[in-house]
Structure formats: structure tokens, C-alpha cells
Amino acid sequence: MKILVANDDGIRSPGLEHLVRMARNLGEVWVVAPSGQCSAMSQRISVFGTLDLQPVPDYPVEGVRAWTVSGSPADCVKVALACVMPEKPDLVFSGINQGYNVGTDILYSGTIGVTMEALANGIPAMAFSTENGEDLRVADAWMLPLVRELLEQPIHPWEVWNLNFPSCDPDCLRGVLYLSLIHI
């Protein structure tokens, strides 16, 4: 499985690195992320000017190809598809965002913007967020098993999964709540 990973918090975000490490358990991982902080950009794309695409040879996760783009999170998906990846990915991951993406926040989220750009290109996607971006214990414990469970069922190119993890002791959780977008 080929997985593109992007985010809105930038190439050096600890959450991105956690997500990339998890994704390595599922297949071949390509990272294309903004060069800086791009929160609340929604699905904004750069229409005028040029974008700077740079390889990141010192990316801290071994075996991962990583680039940075001087544009928005949605630009990262566009650039990955047009200039970086030799083939369309099977799946796009976005995150791990520092803060939940729930309710009307999803309308502004650059993390969700990545998944919407994937959706526009016929690629299924998953967005990952945590309560505060610092305590990733629940995400670390639940992400891989939950993603594997979701991938056991057919995932369609018109689907986006939005996974939000609390910041607490993983033993405090009682389970997973599944909601459709209509329940925002």
C-alpha cells in the first residue's frame, strides 16, 4: 500500500512524525508537508506565484521519502500527485493535528483540507487529531489498531475518516465512538 502523509502543522511537527511512524507499519510512505505552520487554511490552494518544493534528506523516520512545500496543506497533496509520487497513492493520511477537528472546526481545518483534496482526486483519506498535540499516548496506543480495523472494510474514494484522540491515559478509554459528518 502506498500512503501519502501530509499535515497543516509543518514538516517538523512531532504529530507528523508519530503519524509517519505508524503509517510505516502499513506500507510505503511518502511525506509532503508545508514548510511552516498552516493551520486553519481549510482547502486553500496557491493560484498565483510559484511553490518551492524541497527534499528533506534528514527526515527522522528511516525509509521514508519526505519533501516540504512552501504552500498550503492542500497544495502539498497537489504537488505530491503532480511532481513527487510516481503513482497515485492508495490512501492519504493527514495529521496528527494539535487540537481536535470536530464540529464546525472541520470547515477551517488544514488537516481536513488535506483529506478534502485527496477526496477531490479520488483517493480515500484519514485525518488524525489529538486534544492538545502534546500527549499522544492514546493516539500511539489506538491509531494502528483502529486504522487496521477501518481498512478491513472496503474504503471508498469518496470517504474521509476523521479520527480524534483524547489526551489522557489510554486505560481510561471505554471504546470508540463512530459518527457520520451529519452529526457535527
Positions of predicted regions on the chain:
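A cross-family phosphate/adenosyl-ligand binding-site feature
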Residues: 3-6, 14-83, 87-88
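Glycine/threonine-rich flexible loop motifs
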Residues: 100-109
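Conserved small/polar residues in nucleotide/adenosyl-binding loops
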Residues: 182-184
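Class I SAM-dependent methyltransferase SAM-binding "motif I" and its flanking Rossmann-like core
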Residues: 116-131
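Hydrophobic/aromatic beta-strand patches that form the interior of the parallel beta-sheet core
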Residues: 30-32, 67, 126-128, 161-163
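Short, glycine-/small-residue-rich phosphate/pyrophosphate-handling segment
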Residues: 127, 131-149
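Glycine/small-residue-rich loop that forms an oxyanion/phosphate-binding "nest" at active or ligand-binding sites
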Residues: 91, 95-100
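A charged, well-structured terminal subsegment
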Residues: 145-173
